Design a protein with these regions (language model features):
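Acidic donor-binding loop of glycosyltransferase active sites
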Residues: 31-43, 56
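Short glycine/proline-enriched, acidic/aromatic patches that form the donor-sugar handling elements
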Residues: 24-26, 64-69
Length: 151
């Protein structure tokens, strides 16, 4: 099938991982990786954030969610086209440019996408909107009271 074709194309230095890995196993791969390649385009794409949470730089196609989650030149690199040549150029740049990607800096950036931050920001947003709504109701009720007093 297609998996066999891809394995043959990839050669002996590439290992394909099947499904069913535990979170710990996946994190172990992220921790040992030199970089995480993300050549796809997704609206968000959680795997680049997961890799960064392990301090691993991400080499990603520069469209979709990767543009928001990967800081080009700081937490990884973005490439412009979904072509083998563009990906290869990105890998070459990563290998040869000599830029350090401090794992702590990468991990810190990944925290900006944490579940806790999402919960905190959603709660703050809802609290603000509720307060705005209450002010609008008060303004309406004052307006109605003033109108009734005039009649």
């Amino acid at each position: 099938g297609e998996g066999d074709k891809l394995r043959a194309m990839a050669g002996p230095t590439i290992r394909f991982l099947g499904g069913g890995l535990s979170d710990e196993e996946v994190r172990g791969y992220y921790l040992r990786a030199k970089a995480f390649l993300f050549p796809g385009e997704e609206d968000f794409g959680i795997t680049p954030v997961e890799a960064q949470s392990a301090g691993t730089p991400v080499l990603a196609f520069g469209r979709g969610g990767a543009c928001e989650t990967v800081l080009d030149g700081k937490t990884g690199l973005l490439f412009d086209e979904q072509t083998p040549e563009s990906l290869e150029a990105c890998i070459q740049k990563f290998e040869t440019e000599g830029v350090a990607y401090p794992p702590q800096q990468i991990r810190e950036h990944s925290r900006s996408f944490s579940e806790q931050r999402f919960e905190d920001e959603l709660r703050d947003y809802c609290t603000r909107r509720y307060a705005d709504w209450q002010r609008e109701l008060e303004a309406c009720s004052h307006h109605e009271t003033a109108k009734e007093a005039e009649e």
